[in-house]
Amino acid sequence: METMGRHVISELWGCDFDKLNDMDFIEKTFVNAALKSGAEVREVAFHKFAPQGVSGVVIISESHLTIHSFPEHGYASIDVYTCGDLDPNVAADYIAEALHADTRENIEIPRGMGPVQIKQAQAKVL
């Protein structure tokens, strides 16, 4: 099935509090994840929240990687979207391992498959 991209949404639970709260660690992890998947890094932007948490994005030529971390819950919300031949699971796996996630739930969505076609219901009067 040909797509314009693949989008992995990853729910990470049981992650290390200190890693989820360390902006520099998360930034390096995301850049390395992008590079490991074969992506070309274009822009990097991360923000540290008070009292805890980090959000950020790595823009790649092939799309993006994002995170929103909730250290107090040991939870991270991860998106990895790639176009072309890159496998987003390579980056998502790298990130999950780096954050020491105990539990991981993934959904992979093919992107750019065309508009969703919904057929109109036709009713007959009896």
Curated annotation (Swiss-Prot):
Sequence intervals crossing the membrane: none
Cofactors demanded by this protein: pyruvate
Any single biological process term in GO: spermidine biosynthetic process
Residues found modified as Pyruvic acid (Ser): 63
Post-translational modification: Is synthesized initially as an inactive proenzyme. Formation of the active enzyme involves a self-maturation process in which the active site pyruvoyl group is generated from an internal serine residue via an autocatalytic post-translational modification. Two non-identical subunits are generated from the proenzyme in this reaction, and the pyruvate is formed at the N-terminus of the alpha chain, which is derived from the carboxyl end of the proenzyme.
Listed EC numbers: 4.1.1.50
InterPro entries from the UniProt entry: AdoMetDC_C (IPR042286), AdoMetDC_fam_prok (IPR003826), AdoMetDC_N (IPR042284), S-AdoMet_deCO2ase_core (IPR016067), S-AdoMet_deCOase_pro-enz (IPR017716)
GO cellular component, one term: cytosol
Disruption-associated phenotype: Proteome analysis shows that a mutant overexpresses SAM synthase by comparison to wild-type.
GO molecular function: adenosylmethionine decarboxylase activity
Top EC group: lyase
Pathways per UniProt: Amine and polyamine biosynthesis; S-adenosylmethioninamine biosynthesis; S-adenosylmethioninamine from S-adenosyl-L-methionine: step 1/1
Alphabetically ordered keywords of this record: Autocatalytic cleavage, Decarboxylase, Lyase, Polyamine biosynthesis, Pyruvate, S-adenosyl-L-methionine, Schiff base, Spermidine biosynthesis, Zymogen
Catalytic activity: S-adenosyl-L-methionine + H(+) = S-adenosyl 3-(methylsulfanyl)propylamine + CO2
Result of altering residue 63 to A: Loss of function
Record-annotated active site: 63 (schiff-base intermediate with substrate), 68 (proton acceptor), 83 (proton donor)
Note accompanying the cofactor annotation: Binds 1 pyruvoyl group covalently per subunit.
Record-annotated site: Cleavage (non-hydrolytic): 62-63
UniProt key word S-adenosyl-L-methionine: yes
Family statement: Belongs to the prokaryotic AdoMetDC family. Type 1 subfamily.
Job description of the protein: Catalyzes the decarboxylation of S-adenosylmethionine to S-adenosylmethioninamine (dcAdoMet), the propylamine donor required for the synthesis of the polyamines spermine and spermidine from the diamine putrescine.
Oligomeric and partner information: Heterotetramer of two alpha and two beta chains arranged as a dimer of alpha/beta heterodimers.
Protein name: S-adenosylmethionine decarboxylase proenzyme
Gene that encodes the chain: speH
